[in-house]
A protein has these predicted regions:
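Acidic, Ser/Thr/Pro-rich low-complexity intrinsically disordered segments
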Residues: 1-2, 42-123
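Non-catalytic extracellular/lumenal accessory regions of secreted precursors
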Residues: 1-68, 74, 129-141
Length: 141
């Protein structure tokens, strides 16, 4: 069985036999800030250690200010970004099906990323970076 590896926003390494398919068990990468990034080196489309078909990987993070998320996605997976409301209900705010890029402006809140596959075993890579505030007012000198 292959391992999924996440390089977190502070350089921490998470290696798992498989990432959680449920939001409750998803790795929480913490609070995103300008200049931070993370990467996922994953595998999907095989039976996991619990004997369940592994077709989705999930992870979570949050923002405390307006940030732009730039995702270099893998063309072999469907990528969805969700936002959680105060009750923990997830709503899709952006997605790309078998594309290589997803860029979104994020407001403060809790978010999650899902990576899906419809076929057999694949390896995939996703890299994310957070870029400065958007929508901030500029003060005259």
């Amino acid at each position: 069985m292959n391992r999924d590896i996440i390089t977190g926003m502070d350089g921490e390494i998470y290696a798992r036999r498989d990432l959680s398919r449920e939001w409750g068990g998803a790795i929480d990468l913490g609070t995103a800030r300008t200049g931070k990034s993370f990467g996922v080196d994953g595998h999907l489309g095989e039976t996991n250690r619990c004997g369940v078909w592994d077709s989705v990987d999930r992870l979570k993070f949050r923002t405390s200010r307006n940030l732009r998320l730039e995702l270099a996605t893998d063309p072999n997976v469907i990528t969805e970004l969700v936002r959680f409301d105060s009750k923990g209900v997830a709503t899709v705010v952006g997605s790309v099906e078998y594309g290589d890029r997803l860029s979104l402006n994020l407001t403060p809140g809790r978010y999650g990323l899902s990576f899906f596959v419809e076929g057999d075993l694949i390896s995939y890579q996703v890299n994310a970076s957070f870029i400065g505030n958007f929508g901030s007012e500029t003060r005259p000198f």
